[in-house]
Regions:
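Outer-envelope beta-barrel architecture signal
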Residues: 4, 21-29, 57-61, 100-106, ...
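Residues that define the transmembrane beta-barrel architecture of outer-membrane proteins
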Residues: 25-27, 41-47, 78-86, 102, ...
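Gram-negative (and chloroplast) outer-membrane scaffold detector with strong preference
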Residues: 52-125, 183-186
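Short glycine/proline- and aromatic-enriched beta-strand/turn motifs that initiate or cap beta-hairpins
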Residues: 19-70, 182-186
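Cleavable N-terminal export/targeting peptides
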Residues: 1-25, 186
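Membrane-embedded beta-strands of outer-membrane beta-barrel proteins
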Residues: 47-51, 86-88, 142-144, 148, ...
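Extracellular loop and loop/strand-boundary signature of outer-membrane beta-barrel proteins
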Residues: 34-37, 73-79, 126-132, 164-168
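Predominantly the C-terminal beta-signal and adjacent terminal strand-loop region
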Residues: 68-70, 145-186
Length: 186
């Protein structure tokens, strides 16, 4: 009778185990893309890749690189401003569901990189000269990040982020909205 009861209990609890996600030292590679400052993607876009390493409380360290381009209108043409940045930051887990399918993070990051205005060309087609120059950037970002796990190794991500960078002539603040895919590698 005890064996029958044990088999019955085991049969009823099969499939009830939660997924083991965001365990300490797990790592994931993320690729993302988005738009900047509420402009259409043809005028302002960003993309990047990052490596996340999870800590014991489900939070994560993030290290990555990003490309951001915003086109500014001038007469009949546009002037591209491109930023290449490296990021290092900590994202604190704010919320998760019981099945560990949805995670919400808030994070802060340090950023450093380079900004190119019109790819270094200061003379425009109509003879005007740009006073903004290429420069090195430094600053930080505040991020709200969401991960929705599609399987144990694949997650859909979304983020909203505000970047604040100094050292440039073209504006300090940029708001980014993006989506991405994350692959857990170990």
């Amino acid at each position: 009778m005890k064996k029958l009861l044990l088999i019955g209990v085991l049969a009823l609890t099969m499939g009830q185990a939660s997924a083991q996600r965001c365990l300490p030292k797990m790592q994931g590679i993320e690729v993302n893309a988005g738009f900047v400052d509420g402009k259409p993607m043809s005028a302002a876009f960003c993309g990047g890749a990052a490596l996340s390493t999870y800590t014991k409380n489900g939070s994560k360290w993030v290290f990555g690189g990003e490309y951001l381009q915003r086109d500014y209108g001038y007469a009949e043409t546009t002037i591209p401003v491109a930023q290449f940045t490296a990021e290092g930051g900590y994202y604190q887990k704010l919320l998760t569901d019981g099945s560990k399918t949805l995670f919400v993070y808030g994070g802060v990051s340090a950023l450093a990189g380079y900004e190119s205005v019109n790819w270094g060309e200061t003379l425009l087609d109509d003879g005007a000269r740009l006073t903004d120059k290429d420069s090195f950037l430094y600053g930080g970002a505040v991020t709200l990040n969401i991960e929705v796990y599609l399987s144990d190794r694949l997650a859909l991500t979304g983020n909203v982020r505000e970047r604040c960078l100094w050292g440039n002539d073209t504006g300090h603040f940029h708001t980014q909205y993006g989506v991405g895919l994350k692959l857990i590698i170990n």
